[in-house]
């Protein structure tokens, strides 16, 4: 079980409410809440954990939880940026990859770490992020070893 955070989530909620409007979506509310929590890190370091958890939760809410579906979506939206061999490997090994990826590990990032990943390393088009940190790690690991991998499953 995660240790209890020593912060006031009420303060973050009250400050977030002041930014709400009728047309705002839940993803924007999450981003506002995460930014408010991040701005309170100087009051207590646990606000960092709150901010990062909100960011990761929002990222998970807006991305697919299947690696194969993620790489297909990336390729469809980003002009076939990924190698066919990587996509084929993901398709053939869908169950193994699903068992291997532990999305809870995404929650180990601190706020500024996840911000850097989102801004610079996770594949996205415009402001639409397609992958989670664990997807990025899997994409890099498979890509590094593609020449040593049998993609037809035999």
Pin down the residues of each PLM region.
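Extended catalytic cores of very large enzyme megasubunits
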Residues: 1-154
């Amino acid at each position: 079980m995660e240790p209890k955070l020593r912060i006031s989530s009420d303060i973050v909620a009250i400050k977030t409410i002041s930014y709400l409007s009728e047309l705002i979506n839940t993803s924007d509310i999450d981003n506002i809440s995460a930014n408010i929590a991040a701005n309170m890190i100087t009051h207590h370091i646990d606000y960092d954990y709150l901010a990062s958890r909100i960011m990761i939760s929002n990222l998970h809410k807006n991305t697919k939880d299947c690696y194969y579906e993620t790489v297909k979506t990336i390729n469809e939206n980003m002009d076939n940026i990924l190698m066919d061999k990587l996509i084929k490997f993901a398709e053939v090994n869908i169950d193994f990859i699903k068992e291997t990826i532990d999305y809870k590990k995404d929650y180990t990032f601190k706020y500024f770490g996840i911000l850097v990943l989102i801004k610079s390393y996770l594949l996205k088009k415009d402001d639409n992020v397609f992958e989670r940190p664990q997807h990025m790690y899997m994409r890099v690991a498979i890509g590094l070893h593609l020449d040593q991998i049998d993609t037809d499953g035999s």
